[in-house]
From Swiss-Prot:
Keywords: Amino-acid biosynthesis, Hydrolase, Methionine biosynthesis. It is an enzyme of class 3 (hydrolase). The lineage of its organism: Bacteria, Pseudomonadati, Pseudomonadota, Gammaproteobacteria, Enterobacterales. It comes from Klebsiella pneumoniae. This is 5'-methylthioadenosine/S-adenosylhomocysteine nucleosidase. GO terms for biological process: L-methionine salvage from methylthioadenosine. GO terms for molecular function: adenosylhomocysteine nucleosidase activity; methylthioadenosine nucleosidase activity. It catalyses: S-adenosyl-L-homocysteine + H2O = S-(5-deoxy-D-ribos-5-yl)-L-homocysteine + adenine; S-methyl-5'-thioadenosine + H2O = 5-(methylsulfanyl)-D-ribose + adenine; 5'-deoxyadenosine + H2O = 5-deoxy-D-ribose + adenine.
Length: 35
């Protein structure tokens, strides 16, 4: 199952991003995408 989350504040994104296992970061159009 895939879930997409959009966060407006860096603090929100950081809390969720740190909990993602096996995370990869991709930059598309200046935006960071975490998979």
């Amino acid at each position: 199952m895939k879930i997409g989350i959009i966060g407006a504040m860096e603090e929100e994104v950081t809390l969720l991003r740190d909990k993602i296992e096996n995370r990869q970061t991709i930059t598309i159009g200046g935006s960071e995408i975490y998979t």
